[in-house]
């Protein structure tokens, strides 16, 4: 599967607005939910109900929780159907996202270019998965700094672009030029724009990947882009509301999880023999998140009935348990 560039979503060929994306999403909802809809597409009134619920999504963090509902199958419930002779269900729940359908299944992938908003801003590139604007990309010339692109996203947020509307579904922001690229989880508030959580992509040897062609192939192509806003996204439902957020894994964490998968399932050797191994993380590099994601991954695979987490200091026990509970809420 690869990204498809439809003329109807190309703002360099015709005017494309956020409303255009919303109408495209409506078609995707009808496709994904054909059985639930009993072959009768959403009416204007029914889709208005959907949009009312979308406009209640405060920010990207709340959207992340919605997308992770019911074993990572995002849903919107409580939609009442209009009378129709072929409709037997009075109320329905619509599926909007399936994390497990990476590079196949029912997932679709489209690129929208030069998308105008009602605030007069223009999004350079929006990557749509099942019609949802999950990844936003801001492009700059090589003589411009990536900080300028970062501040541009910050300004968009200040003007209301990513709150209580369709664009609140954004989960990852990418700032890029021909010679440099960085990514970060879409902040849940203006105060959460923090350059300390802006990462570069790197390969398995931890060598930074910067050239735009390499970034496309190694980071923004399917399946990796879908995985970044699915498998490699962590929702932290902390006790304190100010600490609640969603996070994207850093590249070395992604490579670590892939290495663990290869070792545990025997995918990294020609004989297909599972074997052990270890992941080397330094202090402050996200060991707890990597451990949680490892345990979660193995627990979903056949042949792994129990995952044991061993800590070498007593004070780490309660701290790790608290973190795992926060990560496991969604």
Question: Which functions belong to the PLM regions below?
Answer:
Residues 3-306, 315-330:
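ATP-dependent helicase/translocase motor core
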Residues 309:
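Conserved, well-structured core segments
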Residues 312:
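Short beta->alpha hinge that forms the Motif I/post-I loop of the SAM-binding pocket
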């Amino acid at each position: 599967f690869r990204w498809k560039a439809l003329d109807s979503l190309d703002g360099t060929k015709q005017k494309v607005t956020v409303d255009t994306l919303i109408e495209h999403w409506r078609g995707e909802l009808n496709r994904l939910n054909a059985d639930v809809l009993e072959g009768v597409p959403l009416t204007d009134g029914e889709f208005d109900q959907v949009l009312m619920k979308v406009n209640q999504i405060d920010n990207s963090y709340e959207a992340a929780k919605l997308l992770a509902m019911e074993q990572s199958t995002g849903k919107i419930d409580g939609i009442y159907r209009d009378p129709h002779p072929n409709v037997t269900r009075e109320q329905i729940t619509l599926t909007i996202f399936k994390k497990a359908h990476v590079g196949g299944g029912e997932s679709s992938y489209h690129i929208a270019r030069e998308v105008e908003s009602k605030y007069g801003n223009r999004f350079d590139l929006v990557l749509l998965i099942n019609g949802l604007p999950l990844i936003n990309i801001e492009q700059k010339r090589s003589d411009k700094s990536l900080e300028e692109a970062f501040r541009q996203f910050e300004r968009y947020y200040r003007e209301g672009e990513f709150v209580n509307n369709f664009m609140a579904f954004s989960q990852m922001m990418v700032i890029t030029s021909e010679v440099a690229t960085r990514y970060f989880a879409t902040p849940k508030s203006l105060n959460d724009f923090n350059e300390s959580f802006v990462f570069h992509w790197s390969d398995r040897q931890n060598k930074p990947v910067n050239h735009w062609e390499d970034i496309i192939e190694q980071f923004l192509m399917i399946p990796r882009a879908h995985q970044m806003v699915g498998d490699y996204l962590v929702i932290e439902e902390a006790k304190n509301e100010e600490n609640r957020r969603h996070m994207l894994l850093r590249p070395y964490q992604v490579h670590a999880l892939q290495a663990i998968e290869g070792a545990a399932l025997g995918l990294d050797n020609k004989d297909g023999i599972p074997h052990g191994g270890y992941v080397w993380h330094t202090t402050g590099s996200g060991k707890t998140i990597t451990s949680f994601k490892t345990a979660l991954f193995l627990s979903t695979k056949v042949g792994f009935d129990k995952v044991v987490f061993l800590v070498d200091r007593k004070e780490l026990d309660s701290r790790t348990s608290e973190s795992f509970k926060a990560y496991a809420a969604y």
